[in-house]
């Protein structure tokens, strides 16, 4: 079943938040700093910004409660060298940037932000999978067909 969901939506480790279809669970972790840390409410992706699509905002409002948000991380791996990792979280760290639009929040750590600044976060729903995805990443040279792996521009 994990292959059907792809690696673009990865479960976190602390507590079950929302059941996904077919028993898939998203899990999460967060602290009281969340509201103070919101640093971007602009829908336009400028220098160092992440833009959220309407479908991303809508899905996040459906699956998050209270101080929960979507965390986007970039890790080494995948077929192209780097891969996107999504999880629900509740803890905002000192090096995190918070991007908020329409009440939905996406948080990116400073190391990962260097690999995704100027990109869009989208939620795609298809017959074979539903997932959050990074689109139009100006830092990516190429990606693979799965949509979760990419190589960077040098």
Curated annotation (Swiss-Prot):
A Pfam short name: Fe-S_biosyn
Binding, Fe cation: 79, 144, 146
GO cellular component: mitochondrial [4Fe-4S] assembly complex; mitochondrial matrix; mitochondrion
InterPro entries registered for this protein in UniProt: FeS_biogenesis (IPR000361), FeS_cluster_insertion (IPR016092), FeS_cluster_insertion_CS (IPR017870), HesB-like_dom_sf (IPR035903)
Principal location listed in the UniProt entry: mitochondrion
Subunit structure: Heterotetramer; forms a dimer of dimers with IBA57. Interacts with [2Fe-2S]-ISCA2 forming the heterodimer [2Fe- 2S]-ISCA2-IBA57 complex; [2Fe-2S] cluster binding is absolutely required to promote the complex formation.
Protein function: Involved in the maturation of mitochondrial 4Fe-4S proteins functioning late in the iron-sulfur cluster assembly pathway. May be involved in the binding of an intermediate of Fe/S cluster assembly.
NCBIfam families with a match to the protein in the record: iron-sulfur cluster assembly accessory protein
Name of the featured protein: Iron-sulfur cluster assembly 2 homolog, mitochondrial
Organism of origin: Homo sapiens
Gene name tied to this protein: ISCA2
């Amino acid at each position: 079943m994990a292959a059907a969901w792809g690696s673009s939506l990865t479960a976190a480790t602390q507590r079950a938040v929302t059941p996904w279809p077919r028993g898939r669970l998203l899990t999460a972790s967060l602290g009281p700093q969340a509201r103070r840390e919101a640093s971007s409410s602009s829908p336009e992706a400028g220098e160092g910004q992440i833009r959220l699509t309407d479908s991303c905002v809508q899905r996040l409002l459906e699956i998050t409660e209270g101080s929960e948000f979507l965390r986007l991380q970039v890790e080494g791996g995948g077929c192209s060298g780097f891969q996107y990792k999504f999880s629900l979280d509740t803890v905002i760290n000192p090096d995190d940037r918070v991007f908020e639009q329409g009440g939905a929040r996406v948080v990116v750590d400073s190391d990962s932000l260097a690999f995704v600044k100027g990109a869009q976060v989208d939620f795609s729903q298809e017959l074979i999978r539903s997932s959050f995805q990074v689109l139009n990443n100006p830092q990516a040279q190429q990606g693979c067909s799965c949509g979760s792996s990419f190589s960077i521009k040098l």
